[in-house]
Amino acid sequence: MDFAANIPKHHSLDHLARPLVTVDDVLISHKNGQYAILLIQRRNEPFESCWAIPGGFILENEPPDCAAVRKLTSETNLKGISLMPIGVFGDQNRDPRGWMITMAYCAIVDQTAVNAFAGDDAADAKWFDLKWEKSGNDMSLSLTHDELVLRALLRKQEVTTSLGPNIRFDQLENYGIAFDHAKIIATAIERMIDFQDT
């Protein structure tokens, strides 16, 4: 039976906004008390030559978790990484091309056990030393690779949703990190690392 043919016109979805949907992957390495994060350098606009976490668009009929694995593999050549969802990000100004909603994933790995190199639309892939400091609700991020330093300052907000308490970050400053990826990185730290340390 063709259920779509029986939908009344007043139930059509044509009048609703349709954001594009993406996935983003945060890969963090932890060894001897030191943290590192895998970033790719963007080959194309927007944010050409800036550094970002791996990710991209979900294909039609593709489950988000499969898209996350596909984009991680295509941009960094890493396979067999088990990713955990950490949040959904949908601020309307997060991408200059239009309204994008992203589902973010994270994995803690040993960078010495994986061999990442750039592929697809990534110009480069590098591990950056990852450091953060907290002062009240503010978190400062520092990502360094040799002489290259990326920084961001974020403010954490605790919000109550219909599903219970949640956190979100507002980006106060950003130097060199594409899109809203500093917010996603801060969320990964809060959910994956600080949670494990408590």
Predicted regions and their residues:
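N-terminal strand-loop-strand
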Residues: A4-I53, D65, G80
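Unchanged
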Residues: I58-S82, G87-D197
